[in-house]
Swiss-Prot record:
Involved in the biosynthesis of isopentenyl diphosphate (IPP) and dimethylallyl diphosphate (DMAPP), two major building blocks of isoprenoid compounds. Catalyzes the conversion of 4-diphosphocytidyl-2-C-methyl-D-erythritol 2-phosphate (CDP-ME2P) to 2-C-methyl-D-erythritol 2,4-cyclodiphosphate (ME-CPP) with a corresponding release of cytidine 5-monophosphate (CMP). One of its GO terms (biological process) is isopentenyl diphosphate biosynthetic process, methylerythritol 4-phosphate pathway. One of its GO terms (molecular function) is metal ion binding. This is 2-C-methyl-D-erythritol 2,4-cyclodiphosphate synthase. Pathway: Isoprenoid biosynthesis; isopentenyl diphosphate biosynthesis via DXP pathway; isopentenyl diphosphate from 1-deoxy-D-xylulose 5-phosphate: step 4/6.
Length: 158
């Protein structure tokens, strides 16, 4: 049996925080605001995986009202989600992700992001695709106010 999941997330850019996307720290004058490390891409991947196994979303599993998850490492959260996927008997077929950001340019960081996601999902890097786009200076991402991400995952029953 195949299961498809979709994830979407948005975080506001703010000064005084590191910019971590896809488990990769990107040099930039702003970072993403959030209760955890605010890794918009890994949150999207986690939500897609949870959706595919009908387990809600990351807000249900890691509520921002719980101090345990303050400044949490999203890579570890994704590993926890992947353990749930495996418990339900699924394995990764592939995942396709898109980052929407006007700045900074993501191209130099795409391959390391793919590698981190593959590591968390215990998959081959060829099963992971990450791409980035601008929004042609339109909307909150185009104005540099935040970064958005979406992902679609395909899982297969072992």
């Amino acid at each position: 049996m195949l299961r498809i999941g979709q994830g979407f997330d948005v975080h506001q850019l703010t000064e005084g925080r590191p910019l971590i996307i896809g488990g990769v720290t990107i040099p930039y004058e702003k970072g993403l605001l959030g209760h955890s490390d605010a890794d918009v891409l890994l949150h999207t991947v986690a939500d897609a995986c949870l959706g595919a196994i009908a387990e809600g979303d990351i807000g249900r599993h890691f509520p921002d009202t719980d101090p345990e998850f303050k400044d949490a490492d999203s890579f570890q959260l994704l590993q926890h989600v992947w353990a749930l996927v495996k418990e339900k008997g699924y394995t990764l077929v592939n995942i396709d992700c898109t980052i929407m950001a006007q700045k900074p340019k993501m191209a130099p960081y795409i391959q390391p992001m793919c590698e981190k996601i593959a590591e968390a999902l215990e998959a081959d890097v060829t099963q992971v695709n990450v791409k980035a786009t601008t929004t042609e200076k339109l909307g909150f991402t185009g104005r540099g106010e935040g970064i958005a991400s979406q992902a679609t995952v395909l899982l297969q029953k072992k």
